[in-house]
């Protein structure tokens, strides 16, 4: 198990009764987490001094309740700076646990000894994009949401990476990869963090159980002859790690790599 223990601006303070108490920089948030099944006493003082509380609705969704919380603030991870702002579905614009992935591939990029081209699909607010760019890679950042790409650009500016070699694209990820195949473009590394369900900018429907394997197959056609890595992150509970391992091992066999 990898643990994101390099944070100074983020920590899980406590958890109980389906909720997590977290510190994001100078502010404390309470958010629901279905994996917190224990019913321990909420004795930590920060439970009573929270700055934001996301209440899940029985009908689905939910809403935020704020207490002296700014609309936006920043936290830092090593050389990177992220702009946070709570929005729908309990999100803040960052998944701190992803820092383990950032550290892993950043070391690979730095030690590659050659220029590395990275494709980041379903790239969200750009955590992986900025980590890869900071490590020295040129990055193509693709997400279907214009708002998320704008947010990622803001994070790049805040991180001092405004002029880094990053291409920002609002596009359907599958259609983009298909076009890259036709163009003959190749990448040394691919990162993807696909949602369980989503829609492209023109209403394209994405369901991970149906679409992830075909996408992996497509991506093998845009990998360079000596790829550095292929990283998939998924929070979909119905998609077991063993299934993803099988897909990657099957489709990437010709590259003679190791699947972890």
Residue positions per predicted region:
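Conserved SAM-binding loop of SAM-dependent methyltransferases across substrates and taxa
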Residues: 125-137
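Conserved SAM-binding motif I beta-strand of class I
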Residues: 138-143
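S-adenosyl-L-methionine
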Residues: 144-191
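Non-catalytic substrate-recognition/targeting regions of SAM-dependent transferases
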Residues: 5-22, 29-96, 103
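Conserved alpha-helix/loop element of class I SAM-dependent methyltransferases that forms part
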Residues: 96-114
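Switch II (G3) loop of P-loop NTPases
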Residues: 194-195
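Conserved class I S-adenosyl-L-methionine
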Residues: 115-124
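C-terminal substrate-binding/active-site "lid" region of AdoMet-derived donor-dependent transferases
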Residues: 38-39, 44, 203-260
